[in-house]
Structure formats: structure tokens, C-alpha cells
């Protein structure tokens, strides 16, 4: 895709899938078939126990490894949690923050998301901050209002000189596991709105530079059509990111010029 002002980012989210040994096998297969001369950024966000194996396997490549969550605290009595310093030391470049599953299953709030975004930036990580609306919110006509609030609260305190390091991922929660499908036009409408919010919060220059991803079941079959939209700069990929061949096809779609 022709992105004059910003990077195209293809980010995989493995969720709770694959063991460290399976991770090593996956990375070996992926390296063998990665397209040559790719220019889009590729991130693979994996379970915490898989991070060391992923980092070791991809050390000599341009693929960035990321985590699926972090804690905003630097250290302390937080059993089961992982700090941003731990992720950085382990070799992570990215971290997903505020995924819809974290918000729904574990009660993460916009304040939690904001604290994690600030901690990630402080640690030198690239936060992939998620936002999105439910079916009820969409049917009530409050998509723009809800997502605008998520972005404002999630980015609170992020200085202008760091906003370009943030990646925003739009998840149409209403179209995930519901049998409904978000069209490329519907996805573009929201991503364009997200960019306008960033423009109002920061500047037109920063809004043009920030990467906005689509996180609604992008796969090797629909990637090109979605990525052809002017305000969709990549994808946060779920199930398709677990298959090396599908990852490569999505990367190839991102590398194709649009008409």
C-alpha cells in the first residue's frame, strides 16, 4: 500500500495459543517463506512464556516481537503480572494494550489502558492501543462518541513528541464472533474518525503520521481490500497469525500498490 506519511504495520496477536517449542517451529517456518524486500513493519505478539523463544528465533530478522499485555507498575507485589521493563529486557518491541478481551474478561478500564500506554512509552515499547464498540453501542448510534472517549482517555498525558510511537487498533467488537461482518467501507469510516480525533488532540501532522490498524478478523482473503482503504494502515491479526503461510499472504497484500 502507498503510505506516504506513515508505516504499514501487520501485527499478529496469538492470544493463548502455542507453546515455546511450537513458537520455535512456527518462526523457523515463517523465516523460510518470508517475502523478500518487504517494507511493512511486522510484529508478532505472543504469550509471555513464548517471548524468549520468539526473540531468539527472529533475532536476525526485521520481525518485531511483542507481548499481549503488561502491567503499568514498575515492580512490586503484583502476582502473575509482567512489567514493561521485563518485556523490554526480554527483547520485546511491541505490546498490545486494551484489547477487547482484556476489557471484557478482566475489567480493564480506560484508566488502566492509559496507565499502561504511558508505562510502555516510558520503557521504549511501541504500544498497540485497542479501541472499539459493541453491537449495542453501534445500534444506539454512539460509535463515534464511545471510541472518541476511549482514545481521549487512553492517550491522556501522552506528549506530542511521543504520539507517533503509538499504534491504534480498531476492533469492531460488534462484528467479532457475532456472524456480522464489517465491510471495508465501515472499517474505513471508523478509522478515518479515529484519525480526526488524533488530529484534534494533537495536530494534522501527527494525525497523518500515526498508524491505525484494523482488528476485525483480517485474514489472507480480505486483507488487500481492507488495506486499500486510505485510513487503514495495517491489521491486528488474530487466528490468521497462527499460520505462517497466512501471515506471509497478508504481508504480501500489504506490499501491493493500490489503484
What are these regions (language model features)?
Residues 1-259:
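Active-site loop-to-helix "anion-binding N-cap" substructures in soluble metabolic enzymes
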